[in-house]
Amino acid sequence: MNEAAPAFPDASVSDCMAVAELLGRAPKTAFTVVVRSADGTPVVTRNAPLERDGTPMPTRYWLLPSSRASQAIGRIESMGGVRAVELVVDPTDLARAHSAYAADRDAAMPAGWTGPRATGGVGGTRLGTKCLHAHYAYFLAGGDDPVGRWVFAQLALHERDIPVRGVESHASVS
């Protein structure tokens, strides 16, 4: 029998307001902020595996769109970053990251849930790389993601501000 809403720790009221402002809409799923900027602004959310209406949510870790990292990653993607990373990342390591991501999302499913479930790994992808933002969010949240590591290295090479795990720090690169 399906439960109506997932059991998942909701964010604080202030986090809900901040995330809604960053998204430009109300969040569709319960979430917890797992990475913040140095000033406390939410950067990455860990999302419940189901939206509030029971629709599967494949994206467990979400890099919020207004972060400096998100904008820089958009530039990397527009310059062919997805193709570039697929040429250098070991497919076995990437498959492991997809499996670990899916296992993390599946472990958060409500007990007894028999309705639809999200499939795939990072961002719902089964193979390869779909979205550098999703891989980077997972990496920042502590996931062992080779694509997220690659994105981190690209940001370190090309951006003055380097987002790091746990806190989006703004360290200068010489």
PLM features: residue spans?
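Aromatic- and glycine-enriched beta-alpha-beta binding-site module
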Residues: V34-L87
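Short N-terminal edge-element motif at the start of the domain
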Residues: M1-N47, D53
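C-terminal charged interaction modules
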Residues: A107-S174
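Intrinsic low-complexity, intrinsically disordered or marginally ordered coil/linker segments
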Residues: M1-V13, A72-I73, M79-E86, T119, ...
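An exposed acidic His-Trp-rich patch
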Residues: R68-A118
